[in-house]
């Protein structure tokens, strides 16, 4: 009997460690839809759009499917050749506003993204993590670049609709649709007023956007997306905060492939 109880307890722990939800306020039934967000925000300046989005998202106005995080597995070898296995949880899609029936992806500045991440016990991914998320994705779409009015609210919504036309209601971890706003040592070392972007992988697995810190931190365009990562990393089934992982000279390689992995969050 004791063995049965122990087995059941072990399975419950394993099941809990393999699933995660972000805790978000319950969405108000009267909250605006994704379409309505873009109609209201069409004339906004970037900081007005940012503030509007943050207010809606922190109030719980996100599609419920976005709360169910997906595990991404990674591993490295230590100096002795021993495998170190880890996994972490990410949102299945990019930060969005609305209901499951009418929602839309919302490009945001890193300051707004960080505010949302902090509120939901999350952080933004690194370049390596974006690569690993792409490899793990079950829905991989071909990038669709747009060239006119790249930073306009209208173009942001048009791009969302194009992606939805490609997706064709397929569900699961999606990638290949956006450049990620990422954490990078290049920001802390060289360009504190900049943002780092990376990704938008093509079907061959190569990113359109190499790691880039040329944009000022308030620049937001249609191609940017915000992927949230739950801040607890499970290393050999031990729960460790992502900052402690990035500070560890060995474990940081699980999450980061840069020489300096000392940029943990964007100030706001």
Stretches found by the model and what they are:
Residues 61-91:
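Conserved oxyanion/phosphate-binding beta-strand-loop segments in alpha/beta enzyme cores
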Residues 97-104, 119-120, 214-215:
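Second-shell loop/turn segments in exported
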Residues 110-172, 228:
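Conserved hydrophobic ligand-interaction patch in extracellular adhesion modules
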Residues 44-48, 66, 81, 103-111, ...:
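Soluble non-cytosolic domains of exported or imported proteins
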Residues 84-86, 120, 222-224:
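Residues that flank catalytic or metal-binding motifs in active/ligand-binding sites
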Residues 149-268:
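C-terminal, surface-exposed recognition/capping segments
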Residues 1-22:
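Bacterial Sec-dependent N-terminal signal peptides
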Residues 21-68, 213, 243, 250-268:
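N-terminal module-boundary/linker segments of secreted carbohydrate-active enzymes
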């Amino acid at each position: 009997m004791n063995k049965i109880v122990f087995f059941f307890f072990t399975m419950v722990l394993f099941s809990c460690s393999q699933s995660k939800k972000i805790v978000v306020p319950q969405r108000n039934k009267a909250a605006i839809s994704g379409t309505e967000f873009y109609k209201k925000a069409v004339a906004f300046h970037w900081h007005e759009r940012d503030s509007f989005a943050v207010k809606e998202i922190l109030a719980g106005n996100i599609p419920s499917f976005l709360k169910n995080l997906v595990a991404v597995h990674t591993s490295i070898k230590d100096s002795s050749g021993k495998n170190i296995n880890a996994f972490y949880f990410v949102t299945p899609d990019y930060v969005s506003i609305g209901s499951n029936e009418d929602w839309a992806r919302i490009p945001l500045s890193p300051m707004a993204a960080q505010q949302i991440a902090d509120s939901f016990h999350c952080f933004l991914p690194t370049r390596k993590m974006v690569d690993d998320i792409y490899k793990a994705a079950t829905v991989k779409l071909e990038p669709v670049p747009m060239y006119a009015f790249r930073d306009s609210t209208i173009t942001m919504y048009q791009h969302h609709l194009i992606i939805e036309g490609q997706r064709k209601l397929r569900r699961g971890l999606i990638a290949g649709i956006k450049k990620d706003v990422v954490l990078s040592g290049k920001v802390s070392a060289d360009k504190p007023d900049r943002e780092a972007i990376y990704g938008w992988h093509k079907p061959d697995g190569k990113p359109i956007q190499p790691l880039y810190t040329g944009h000022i931190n308030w620049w937001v365009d249609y191609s940017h997306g915000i992927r949230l990562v739950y801040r607890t990393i499970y290393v050999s089934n031990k729960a460790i905060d992502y900052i402690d992982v990035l500070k560890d000279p060995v474990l940081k390689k699980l999450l980061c492939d840069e020489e300096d992995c000392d940029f943990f969050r964007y100030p706001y």
